[in-house]
Amino acid sequence: MPDRGVPQDPALTHLAVAGYRSLQQLTLPLGGLTLVCGANGCGKSNLYRSLGLISAAARGDLVATLAAEGGLPAVFWAGPERTTAAMRRGEQPVQGSSGRREAARLRLGIAGETLSYAIELGYGADDHTSAFVLDPEIKREWLWAGGPFHPRSLLVQRNGAVVERCGEGGRNQPLALEVSPHESLFTAVSDPLDAPEVFQLRRT
């Protein structure tokens, strides 16, 4: 396997959040010291909590952390799927509708100069008779080289229960099969020899 130049101490440059509490979609540049200020209720606490969720994913207890917050129904963005121009001008209230056209998803990401990571969570079983239908599940994860995402930059990806190392020309190598929907790739693939990128980013 060719050496992809995994860094010793990747610096983080951006935090991205979508669908979490009051944060419909936000990308925040990060520096050596990032100061966030604003009026009460503008989302500062939710921004801090979202960063804590990414840390929980690295520790392997993200789903438990979400459950402690009240589960996905308590943390999902409750506003509209689309923000209209009238809403942005203050001419129309910003509120959710009774029906959703798209599956509810919580997306979190952290970007670095050399390594970046994103995770997508959603509800569990589609069987609405199941007692676990509202349980949070990890749907997808991505780990890529560099900051801005590009498919060619993917190093490791998770789709459902499968974690793969991404190879040239779409030739992917399975790293873990039958991964629990409550387990992130950081704990499913923990061997630094199999996936040094995962091991290194987890330490960041």
Whereabouts are the PLM-identified features?
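Hydrophobic anchor at the beta1->P-loop junction of P-loop NTPases
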Residues: 36
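Conserved P-loop NTP-binding catalytic core
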Residues: 49-126
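ABC ATPase nucleotide-binding domain
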Residues: 27-29
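Electropositive, glycine-dotted interaction segments
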Residues: 107-204
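Conserved lysine of the Walker
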Residues: 44
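N-terminal pre-Walker A segment at the start of P-loop NTPase domains
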Residues: 2-24
